[in-house]
Amino acid sequence: MLYLTEEHCIGGRRKMTDLQECRNEIDRIDSEIVRLFERRMKVSEDVAEYKIHTGKQVLDPVRERDKLKVLRAQAHSEFNARGVQELFQQVMAISRKRQYQLLTEEGVDEPRDYHMTDSLPLNDVTVVFQGVEGAYSYAAMRAYFPDEIRNYHVKTFRDAMEEVSAGRADYAVLPIENSTQGIVTDIYDLLTEYQLYIVGEQVVKADHVLLGIPGSSVAEIRTVYSHPQALAQCRKYLEAHPGWETVKAANTAASAKMVKEEGDPSRAAIASREAGEFYGLAVLGENLCHNGQNVTRFIIVSSRPVYEKNAEKVSVCFELPHESGTLYNMLSHMIYNGLNMTKIESRPIPGKTWQYRFFVDFLGNLEEPAVKNALRGLEAEADSMRVLGNYGRQEED
């Protein structure tokens, strides 16, 4: 028979205990814990009812901190004290989540600026994009909006946000992430700076080609222009031509425009096929990306806080107390409510050394109870939280 040298306290004495006997006792204790947990949750629901009728906040950090201090003091070792604290932090978090659910079930909604609409107004609107005609932002705009729109371009992402904020444009089209180069950090920072809202997204495949003036050839090329990300995405192709000088440009379409204006057969641009057609350039090389699934996701930004009734993706950002476990606690609101988180990013908070703002995307609609529960918890327990948008999701081709 298998024995363990576990300490089993009976009448103050220690003795060798059979493993199965230990397991049986643990099972009895666990069953008692479940019974007491459900009893505690019932009392927690009574607390929620009181808070519903009085308007008292669910989270009471002073009460929880004092309670944890008392519980820790009841443990008989430092190891157990830490365990008690972790255990009851989770118990309290679950209790709060149940209270958030009850608030939603009782129809106690958090005030939000957002308004639901059957569909976004896309006709007879003005759209701004960063870059020039032929850029991937231009392609994203043409894919998302009908032909009957007014559009114009600006030099920078900030300029595009400013145009929408000032009311000169109804929407802006902005790149937010690329499948090979990652996020566009400037866009994340601007989303927190401007009170604008994500109302849609568009995925565009970045099919880079080498463009030159008509009649030129690859053998004549000495200089290649493009955006730094495009140059990085075509690194292996460029390494196969060590004699070429690479020059950074504001964007891919701007590099194509530059080659067209210079009219020099020794100069080429890495840009889209559409940019080549727009500027009358010849395709000298194809399939330049070393990653065949090179796609860019663009967001559609508006000054109006609206979402379509069939919207299925939510974007939020939040800041946290600089304390252990706070990020886990925030993400647990999505996990507990069965929400599928599709993305998480972080950006440094200006003026707060080593502190970060988090950006999270998850699937859902602002009308869904699970989403309301999660947002209620995030808003109550983060230092600050903002819903950036609720919009339709586009899958990659």
Residue spans of the language-model regions?
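Domain-level signature for soluble enzymes in the chorismate/prephenate branch of the shikimate pathway
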Residues: 2-4, 10-397
